[in-house]
Amino acid sequence: MRNRLITALTLLTGILLICSFALGEDVILTVGGQTFTCAADATQIDLGDVTVPDTDEDYAALRAFLDKLPGLTKVDMFSTDISPERLLALAPEYPQIKFGCTIIIPCRNTLRKDRPPHRLRTDDTAFSTQHNLSSSSHDESVWEVLKYCPDLLALDIGHNNTIKDYSFLNYVPNLRVLIMSFNRNQRGEEGPPIDISPIGNMKDLEYLEICKSNIADISPLANCTKLMDLNIGTNHIKDLTPLYGLKSLRKLFLFSCHNYSGKAIPKEEVKELQDHIPDCVINNTHLNCGGPWRQGSHYQTLASMFSYQMLDKPQAYEPFEDED
C-alpha cells in the first residue's frame, strides 16, 4: 500500500512538473522601481504605464526580460520615451518583435526656447518637425528610425539642412505627402546633388515639396503619377522632361529651379511643360514657397494634419478632399 502511494505521488509530481513546464512560469520585468508581469508563452504584450528609464542598466533588464519570451511578436511600450539611438540598438536584436514606442528627438529653436522635443510614435500616420530657419537640424542618421514607422502617410522634415542622403525614405514608400524643402546647407557647404531615387518608389505620392534642397536629377518623379502638387524651385534641375507624363499635376512651382540665381526659367520651357500637362497651373514667378503655394484646400489640409497652428494638437493623416 505504501509503495503504491509513493508511486502515485511520484506520478503526480511528474505530471505537475510537466504542466508547469508546458504552461511556463510568469516572467517579471523590473525597471525604475516598476514591475510588469506576463506569461512565459505571451506573444503580444503592452507595458501600459510602465516606463523604461533611459539608463544602460534598465535597458539591460528589458533585454533580459525579452530573452525569456521567445514567442513575442509585438511589444507596446508607448509610455516610454526612447531616443533614436536606443531604438536603433534595441530593435535589430529582436527582429521578430514589432516595437510600439514613442521616439524622442531633441529640438533647439532660438525663437522658441520653450519648444519641447519632437515626439514620433511608431504608429503615427503623420509627422512634422514643424521646423523653421531657427531650428536645429537632424541629419539622416536620426531618420533611420522611420524603418519602425510603417504607418506613416505624411512626413514633413523640411529645414533640416544637414541631410545629404535620402536613403531612409525607402522605409516609407506609402507616403502621400512629403516635405523636404530648405534642406540645402545654409552655409554653402553643399556637396554633390542629392539622389532622390527613393521618392520614385512612392507610387501614391500626391504632394511633394523639395524646393531649395540641392537636387539636380528629377527623373525618379516620372514614377509618381499621382502627384497633384509639386514644388521644385531653387535647385540645379536642367531636365524637366520627367514631368511630362504627370497628368495628375494641378500645381507646379519651379521658379529658379535651374540654379540658385533667383530668376525665372525660360518661357519656352514653361510652354513646353504646359503643352504636356495642360491641366496644371505652373508658377514661374514666386520664389520657393511664396505666393499661392501655401494657399488653397490642399495646404489647409496639410496645416490641419501637421498641426501647424496648434503645436500641441496630435498629428494625423487627412486625405485631400479631391483625392480619387
What is the predicted function of each stretch?
Residues I28-A40, Q44:
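Compositionally biased P/S/T/G-rich terminal and signal peptide-adjacent segments
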Residues M1-T10:
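Bacterial N-terminal signal peptides that target proteins for export
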Residues L66, L90, L146, L169-N170, ...:
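Hydrophobic anchor residues at the C-terminal helix/turn of individual leucine-rich repeat
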